Regions:
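Hydrophobic membrane-embedded alpha-helices
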Residues: 2-11, 17-265
Length: 265
């Protein structure tokens, strides 16, 4: 019997909250100072879905790295190409001065290393947000593409070698990777320049990895009938989490030290 994926409707709500936070941050950067944290939710969702779908493909004996890469490429590149070309065309006509270095930046976008390109060119996200740079936000896609390249290799290692030896304890492989990412962010943080830890794939991977852990363990938690996430307890936890998220979106500032010393996790 083939295993199928049942879509979690809560993901749509989490995406909506994340998008709202990010959009409001870009429209009102001084009023919605912490809206950029919505990006963390997108990485978490990506990791969760990667784990759920990876596990289903594994159970159905249909997990193939080559097919995975082709599928992801076909999902990302057509829309990305159209968007980048449309933006370049628009700014060529109306704001050509904002396209200085566009060729190098476009190459970094299509090759999936725009986050590192922005880091190396000292393009601070929190400074550029008020300058309306057309491609500032694509650092996120760079991190996402790099994580999606590494993910099937990690998953194959997990299923082929770690899980057969450690059983249910194998999940600690991803937990420890997430912890290492959080520690890396804290260790590499410098108050005068947060670019390295904000844009770095290694220092942003923890959100994706937390999502992976949630995706791989969700079925086990459901089978155990975990009352923490059910009924009144679940609703109370949901509203408490929503209030905390809204508070963070309003109160947090992008260059506060505690964020990079475990706060984003």
């Amino acid at each position: 019997m083939r295993t199928t994926y049942t879509y979690n409707e809560g993901i749509n709500f989490l995406r909506a909250v994340s998008i709202l936070g990010i959009v409001l941050y870009h429209i009102f950067p001084f009023a919605m100072k912490g809206g950029f944290l919505g990006v963390c939710f997108f990485f978490l969702i990506s990791g969760y879905l990667a784990a759920k779908k990876g596990q289903i493909d594994w159970d159905n004996e249909s997990f193939h790295i080559r097919k995975y890469y082709i599928k992801k490429g076909l999902r990302i590149y057509p829309a990305l190409y159209i968007m980048v070309m449309a933006v370049i065309a628009f700014f060529t006509v109306f704001h050509q001065e904002l396209l200085l270095g566009a060729r190098e930046e476009a190459a970094s976008i299509f090759l999936g290393y725009n986050n590192w390109w922005q880091m190396l060119t000292q393009a601070s996200y929190f400074m550029k947000i008020t300058e309306h740079s057309p491609f500032t936000h694509l650092w996120y896609l760079g991190v996402e593409m790099e994580l999606l390249v590494v993910w099937p290799l990690l998953f194959l290692l997990y299923k082929k070698w770690i899980e057969p030896r450690l059983g249910k304890g194998a999940i600690w492989f991803f937990v420890l990777l997430a912890v290492a990412s959080v520690f890396a962010m804290g260790l590499m943080y410098h108050a005068d320049n947060v670019n390295r830890v904000y844009y770095g794939t290694d220092t942003r991977a923890f959100s994706f990895l937390i999502g992976v852990v949630l995706g791989l363990k969700e079925d086990d938690w459901n089978k155990k009938g975990n009352i923490l996430f059910q009924g009144d307890n679940g609703r109370a936890l949901f509203f408490a989490s929503l209030l905390v998220t809204i508070a963070l979106f309003v109160l947090v500032e992008g260059e506060q030290a505690w964020l990079y010393r475990g706060g984003m996790a």
